[in-house]
Every structure is written in C-alpha cells, then in structure tokens.
C-alpha cells in the first residue's frame, strides 16, 4: 500500500481568551419544528360578502387637482383662515407666506422620483413672520400678496423653529378658475 505525505506550511493562531467560547453552528437545522403548510394570502378567501370583494374608488385625478392640506374642502373664507392662523400661532409656530405663479400643484419636470424635486419649492413672500402674535398681521400680508400676484397660488405655512420642520401648510388663495 503506497502512501504519500504532503507537507504544506500552515500557520495557526490560538486565542486563549476565547477558549471558553462555543464554535458557531455549521450544520443544517431540522425542519421538523417549522410549519409545513403554506398560508393563503388571497383576501378573497376571507371576504364575508359571499366571495365578492369590492374596493373603494380613489379620487379621480383628471380635472380635479388637489394641492395641500385642506384642499379637499371648499375654499376657506377669511374667518376660517384666521382660525387656522390662530391655531398655528397658539402652537408657537412661525407663520410664513409662499407663492407660486406657474404650478400650484405637484409636478415633475426634470425628475421622476417623489421627493423635494417635484415642484414643492415655492417662492417665499417676504421673510418669515418671526415674533408675530396676531392672525390679522398674517391676513394683511396675505392681502398684499393677493394684490401683487392675483394669478398666483398663495399658501400659509407654519414653521417650528425648535424642531426645524414645517408643521402645517395650506392653500390660502387660488387664482380664478382653480
């Protein structure tokens, strides 16, 4: 019987600190502990209306553009706008007016992914109203913006300077025909 001996240099390291550690599991686990029946994810099997599943219709997007918060409601009158502005002032947020002359809704011109490159940046009307405590001051600025840009969209935002986030945003004025 012929035998051959191959000699190769081998370097081994011994870690004395890990001598009490158990080697990781390297074999296959038994499948006996796992369920073998596949669940059915079809929602028609759990429908309680005799097997007929009806879905709700989404809002039709053609000819009914929606803008921001409260845009599904009728336009706000001056008293309702004042209440919204009082709310954001009570929360300690800083009111600010923004306007847009061309696109008052989300649009994608150069990018197809939803994010901040989809037409959400509007032009700021003056500076944020730091120190504002009265809703009539904001409504006065809104009137000035409406006279300056009668064919533009104007929105009021509330900015939280502690968390540095925009907390509320709603359309305060839409041009005629929208």
Swiss-Prot record:
Indicate whether Transport appears among the record's keywords: no
In chain numbering, the transit peptide falls at 1-54
Would you say which domain of life the source belongs to?
Eukaryota
Record's InterPro entries? RuBisCO_ssu (IPR024681), RuBisCO_ssu_dom (IPR000894), RuBisCO_ssu_N (IPR024680), RuBisCO_ssu_sf (IPR036385)
Q: Where in the cell is it found?
A: Plastid, Chloroplast
Please list the coiled coil stretches.
Answer: none
GO CC terms for this protein?
A: chloroplast
Which UniProt keywords are present, listed alphabetically?
A: Calvin cycle, Carbon dioxide fixation, Chloroplast, Photorespiration, Photosynthesis, Plastid, Transit peptide
Biological processes annotated in GO = photorespiration; reductive pentose-phosphate cycle
* TM stretches of this protein: none
List the molecular function annotations (GO) for this entry.
Answer: ribulose-bisphosphate carboxylase activity
Q: List the disulfide bonds.
A: none
Listed under subunit, the entry gives:
Heterohexadecamer of 8 large and 8 small subunits.
Extra notes? The basic functional RuBisCO is composed of a large chain homodimer in a 'head-to-tail' conformation. In form I RuBisCO this homodimer is arranged in a barrel-like tetramer with the small subunits forming a tetrameric 'cap' on each end of the 'barrel'.
Task: Family membership, please give it.
Answer: Belongs to the RuBisCO small chain family.
The protein's role, per its UniProt record: RuBisCO catalyzes two reactions: the carboxylation of D-ribulose 1,5-bisphosphate, the primary event in carbon dioxide fixation, as well as the oxidative fragmentation of the pentose substrate. Both reactions occur simultaneously and in competition at the same active site. Although the small subunit is not catalytic it is essential for maximal activity.
Q: What is this protein called?
A: Ribulose bisphosphate carboxylase small subunit, chloroplastic 1
Q: Which gene encodes it?
A: RBCS1
């Amino acid at each position: 019987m012929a035998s051959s001996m191959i000699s190769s240099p081998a370097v081994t390291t011994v870690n004395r600190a890990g001598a009490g550690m158990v080697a990781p599991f390297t074999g296959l686990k038994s499948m006996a502990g796992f369920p073998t029946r596949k669940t059915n994810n079809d929602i028609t099997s759990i429908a309680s209306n005799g097997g007929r599943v009806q879905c709700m219709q989404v809002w039709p997007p053609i000819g009914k553009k929606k803008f921001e918060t409260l845009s599904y409601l009728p336009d706000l009158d001056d008293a309702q706008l004042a209440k919204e502005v009082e709310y954001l002032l009570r929360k300690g947020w800083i009111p600010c007016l923004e306007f847009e002359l061309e696109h008052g809704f989300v649009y994608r011109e150069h990018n197809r992914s939803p994010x901040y490159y989809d037409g959400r940046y509007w032009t700021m009307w003056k500076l944020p109203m730091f120190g504002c405590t009265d809703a009539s001051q904001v409504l006065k600025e809104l009137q000035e913006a409406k006279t300056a840009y009668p064919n533009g969209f104007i929105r009021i935002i509330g900015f939280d300077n502690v968390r540095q986030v925009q907390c509320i945003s709603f359309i305060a004025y839409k041009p005629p025909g929208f």
